[in-house]
Amino acid sequence: MYSEIQRGRADIGGLMARPEYREWNPELIKPKKLLNPVKASRSHQELHRELLMNHRRGLGVDSKPELQRVLEHRRRNQLIKKKKEELEAKRLQCPFEQELLRRQQRLNQLEKPPEKEEDHAPEFIKVRENLRRIATLTSEEREL
């Protein structure tokens, strides 16, 4: 079986073009295959070995890249800091500011119900009010 493969390769070698630079000038510098700097580095080899071992053991590598995990971690930390600052700001408010906020909220609540009543008013009342406004505008224009 192995010998058949070797014979097949020998036949293919005869079909492939051989470089001509070897034959016509022996003084030329012959090219060498360049080393891949990534694969040549020790850290890359160790990383590759670790990934292979994890794959063999069935340990899944996190689906997210490291950069994305770091960014999510930073966002979470920023949100936590922001919430802490808001809570701290609420605690540090003096009683006077708290009372002002309560009064402002009460005023807002008192102003909202009249708007709701206008929304529920029948359409003919709204049209009548619009006609009154138009009538007053036209009378003012006539005076000018």
Swiss-Prot record:
Coiled-coil parts of chain: 67-94
GO BP: any one term: regulation of actin cytoskeleton organization
InterPro entries: FAM107
Sequence ranges of Basic and acidic residues compositional bias: 112-124
GO molecular function: actin binding
Subcellular location: Nucleus; Cytoplasm, Cytoskeleton, Stress fiber; Cell junction, Focal adhesion; Cell projection, Ruffle membrane
Function field: Stress-inducible actin-binding protein that plays a role in synaptic and cognitive functions by modulating actin filamentous (F-actin) dynamics. Mediates polymerization of globular actin to F-actin. Also binds to, stabilizes and bundles F-actin. Involved in synaptic function by regulating neurite outgrowth in an actin-dependent manner and for the acquisition of hippocampus-dependent cognitive function, such as learning and long-term memory.
Subunit (UniProt): Interacts with ACTB. Interacts with COMMD1; this interaction stabilizes COMMD1 in the nucleus. Interacts with MAP1A. Interacts with PRDX1. Interacts with F-actin.
PANTHER family assigned: ACTIN-ASSOCIATED PROTEIN FAM107A (PTHR16768:SF3), DOWN REGULATED IN RENAL CARCINOMA 1/TU3A (PTHR16768)
Family as reported in the entry's similarity comment: Belongs to the FAM107 family.
Listed name of the protein: Actin-associated protein FAM107A
Lineage, broadest ranks: Eukaryota, Metazoa, Chordata, Craniata, Vertebrata
